[in-house]
Amino acid sequence: MTGTTRWRALLLAAVAACAACGLIYELALLTLSASLHGGGIVATSLIVAGYVAALGAGALLVKPLLGHAAITFIAVETLLGVIGGLSAAAMYVAFSFIGGSLWVLVLGTAVIGTLVGAEVPLLMTLLQRGRTTGAADAGRVLANLNAADYLGALIGGLAWPFLVLPALGMIRGAAVTGMINLAAAAVVAVFLLRSIIGRRQLASALAVLTAAALGLTALIVASDGIQSTTRQRLYADPIIAYQQSAYQEIVVTRRGTDTRLYLDGGLQFSTRDEYRYTESLVYPALGDEARSVLVLGGGDGLAARELLRMPQVGQIVQVELDPAVIALARGPLRGANAGALDDPRVQVVVDDAMIWLREPGALPEGGFDAVIIDLPDPDNPVLGRLYSLEFYALVTRVLAVDGLVVVQSGSPFSTPNAFWRTVSTLGSAGFAVTPYHVHVPTFGDWGFALARRGTSAPTPTVPEDAPPLRFLTQQVLDAATVFPPDNAPQVLEPSTLDNPRIVEDMRAGYR
């Protein structure tokens, strides 16, 4: 291998490393958006569009500096390593202390995108320099550059969800990525550009890179303390457990006897009043004959806890996407769910609910007597598909002929369109539906949809052999089916995979 070939290979390797780092910064901000803002389609679109637009802006803004490509490249990579490395910590701290706006994240994305966009013109200029490549064919140079750039992006895209985020978290992961960015700049400066920029400029560049690396090292060391301090400011009660899983940020808080679970910042339950929600969700779907029950979502184990109180229920299949939620249900939340997920009658399946419904494997004879759908609110397209016409059609394949389905459907008062959209979508899927709602102090007015196949809507009833309940009675349930004039039933178009209308209903906000 000639010296020129080695230089070219080393520079292309640096291109791949820088591309990987750039995409990781972008994914870190998208992950942060999901944690702080819910990660809706609008937020994701704004961040991605802002990043892509900034790439073009960076390519234009760097044009006057192409005559000094070597030192400009080192400066850009230094800034990118520092700003990208600090981005997650800075955004998290800003949100925790002063509150945050989506536009702050978009601005951060634009700055990083501008710096990333400047890389390709600079590298193209360096690769065409006689002292660096000796190549005269601009098309071949551009092809090699693009190949290295796209390969690096692939590496970064795979590294973030499977390696960096699970192992390091957002703040430390972004900082380590910044260190890699700085290292790539240092390698290029020492081995490729020293003959171009001169010893004095090289020494200055290395000094700045070293100082930046030391700063990021300090951030890595302090990241746990920074994150725990800033995270605690987002929650009123002391945090007792935290995990950033591959799917979401999970936080458990506790004050006295009140334990609360949050997913991506959204409250899932409070032990102060979750029994109102859980009893209202579970018991109307059971009737007096339900022996096999499918629970989709509900990985906290609270629904399973109530099901196990019914003596005739002999089989519970619990399908939960996130193994981290199951681990917490068996750990810090064990007291809340009475160890339900470790009961031999409960089969825990870690899978996406829709994927599992397509290939559910062995089913109880005749199908499940009851299906309880306890999923987070559909505030993004990933969750929206679990409230779609196609999803409910899959549910019919595993449901017994006379079985009942219950769906947690959000607040009929605060998000009425989303609530009635769920009811209408179930109806379009071939179910006869009875909506009902109860007051849960933590959530406010909260609604459910009880459904069976056919044209005869079920009447919500408390099973005769139900154990003593703290909230639900037949009188409460009868009243729950009545809706006042300011929240009268609506018939809406169904939400589908092609047109997830329910996500737009949620995005429209709370009245």
Report the location of each language-model feature.
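Alpha-helical transmembrane segments of multi-pass membrane proteins
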Residues: 1-242, 246, 254-257, 261-265, ...
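SAM/dcSAM-binding transferase cores
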Residues: 248, 455-511
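Solvent-exposed, non-transmembrane alpha-helical starts
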Residues: 272-276, 380, 461
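Short alpha-helical "patches" and their helix-cap loops
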Residues: 292-298, 461-465
